[in-house]
Amino acid sequence: MRKRKLGTSDLDISEVGLGCMSLGTEKNKALSILDEAIELGINYLDTADLYDRGRNEEIVGDAIQNRRHDIILATKAGNRWDDGSEGWYWDPSKAYIKEAVKKSLTRLKTDYIDLYQLHGGTIEDNIDETIEAFEELKQEGVIRYYGISSIRPNVIKEYVKKSNIVSIMMQFSLFDRRPEEWLPLLEEHQISVVARGPVAKGLLTEKPLDQASESMKQNGYLSYSFEELTNARKAMEEVAPDLSMTEKSLQYLLAQPAVASVITGASKIEQLRENIQAANARRLTEEEIKALQSHTKQDIYKAHRS
């Protein structure tokens, strides 16, 4: 598995990371997927305190025992469970982040986190206070680096300007090219993109689109109608015909210099192997990249711009 540097950090992360949210709560099944991922060269595991109310972090913590130093461990904070209910609310305060990291460390059974990420964010947050919390955790040695998980332009601009983030996690795929607006700025500041949702809810895999859900057929995906999705997918299948749709989807993202890793989920080992195969496929040519772009939209985020 090829690796890339994460921003200005000294972390070399696998080009495909495992999004642990998809593992579920059946421990033995989840551990078998995690073991296989690590065995096949994935060293980047992405979790969050929100997933399964912390149970996800506990399972990941079990999986990395005796090989912690071989793993780049990323988790997230900022969503606070509402005691006595199944809901949560947003709390990016310094006090909560410093409380949350201690609980994550306990669940993960480790004394440090490689990448600690703010799990969302709004322009109304006290961003200076949030940055201060992350910087203090770095100084304390509790976290090595920090980043954000956000798609909001105004939030991204503030963190690029004010903080030492090394990465931004964003939903990014051939059917959601909105992050491309930000790639030049992030490259200039040596901030990496960690791309999630690379196959757009399965629309960019080998699964026939006629098997899509009724909701997808009626509502489409983002700005695409279902007819547009069908036409675009058919056209893209004819580009680089030696590659599967999954391979093209991941290789398109990995062709972007700002992208350090593509986060893929897997609830079965077969999915995991397919994603790793896609990461290890041949690179796309410039002509193939342009052809794929010609069949898709480059939208921008229209909200949260100021």
From Swiss-Prot:
Short name of any one Pfam family annotated for the protein: Aldo_ket_red
Binding site for NADP(+): G197, P198, V199, A200, K201, G202, L203, L204, T205, E206, K207
Keywords associated with the record: NADP, Oxidoreductase
Superkingdom per UniProt: Bacteria
Cross-referenced InterPro entries: AKR, AKR2_Oxidoreductase, NADP_OxRdtase_dom, NADP_OxRdtase_dom_sf
SUPFAM superfamilies reported for this sequence: NAD(P)-linked oxidoreductase
GO molecular function terms attached to this record: oxidoreductase activity
Enzyme Commission (EC) number: 1.-.-.-
CDD domains: AKR_AKR11C1
Active-site residue list: Y51
Enzyme's top EC category: oxidoreductase
Recorded family membership: Belongs to the aldo/keto reductase family. Aldo/keto reductase 2 subfamily.
Name of the featured protein: Uncharacterized oxidoreductase YqkF
Species per Swiss-Prot/TrEMBL record: Bacillus subtilis (strain 168)
Lineage: Bacteria, Bacillati, Bacillota, Bacilli, Bacillales
